[in-house]
Design a protein with these regions (language model features):
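Extracellular glycoside hydrolase catalytic/binding regions
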Residues: 3-7, 12-191
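Aromatic-rich peripheral "rim/lid" segments of glycoside hydrolase catalytic domains that contact
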Residues: 169-257
């Protein structure tokens, strides 16, 4: 609690699970069931804030949420009719439940940060990555109802906790992953969404990193894609979140911005 470099607790990485294994499915409702991620997050936050009341509390989403007319007792899918009863999302990316049952931190509500994760078709060919997808089509089919509404309705601050992926021709020959990365990057710039990029190291098998060749080479192309989404002034100087200390040798402090 005395370490002032720790500003937030991300309570759990990527809660997930589907109804085909109910005991392992993270859900989001107003119950006190042991697999209710909302309730678990509120309990965990209470414990953390009792020790350090100054921290931000980051809460990720879940994987699935029941479609209209169904509840958490529905099976994952009716294979005879090919009917799906849940809205799917990336692990940690589904905040549909927060619309009716938002996280309640009591007197610490202003310290809540919702944190979705988002990835491209090289991680998994989700339905919204159909041929000809655009930023607008992903927004309509996935982003808005799963997490973007939280920003638009000013429910709580939003941090894109993970986004990233391959952009080289070997891994992304048709350019679809690069297209998704660009769509999300531009959305975050347009809406001033905070984010943390996944990842620096090269040994993340389905995304790669900002370095390669046994950590010896900086990926200039990938950095060039990410760089416009990093906070900088009109002269390209990166801006620190600290009012006193600049970020890096060529950056500026928040007070100097």
């Amino acid at each position: 609690k005395d370490n002032d470099t720790i500003v937030a607790f991300d309570l759990k990485n990527e809660p997930h699970g589907k109804a085909d294994v109910p005991s392992q499915m993270a859900k989001w409702d107003d119950s006190k069931d042991p697999n209710n991620w909302k309730y678990a997050a509120e309990c965990a936050a209470e414990k953390v804030l009792a020790i350090n009341p100054n921290l931000l509390i980051m809460v990720e989403g879940i994987e699935v949420y029941p479609k209209e007319g169904y509840d958490w007792t529905a099976p994952a899918k009716d294979w005879t009719t090919n009917t799906e009863f849940y809205y799917g999302a990336w692990w940690g990316g589904n905040f549909r439940g927060a619309k009716e049952n938002p996280i309640d931190l009591g007197e610490h509500q202003s310290q809540l940060v919702y944190s979705p994760h988002d990835y491209g078709p090289l991680v998994y060919e989700q339905s919204w990555f159909h041929e000809g997808f655009t930023q607008e089509s992903i927004m309509e089919e996935y982003w808005y109802d799963n997490w973007f509404y939280l920003l638009e309705e000013k429910t709580a601050p939003l941090l894109m906790g993970e986004w990233g992926g391959f952009i080289d021709e070997q891994h992304d020959p048709d350019g679809a992953n690069t297209k998704w990365l660009t769509c999300l990057r531009d959305l975050m710039i347009e809406n001033r969404i905070h984010h943390t990029f996944w990842c620096f190291n090269e040994n993340s098998g389905d995304t790669g990193g900002l370095v390669y060749d046994n950590f010896g080479t900086w990926d200039e192309d990938k950095y060039a894609l990410v760089k416009p989404a990093l906070w900088q002034d009109e002269n390209g100087k990166f801006i620190s979140l600290d009012h006193k200390f600049a970020i890096g040798a060529n950056g500026i402090s928040l007070s100097d911005y």
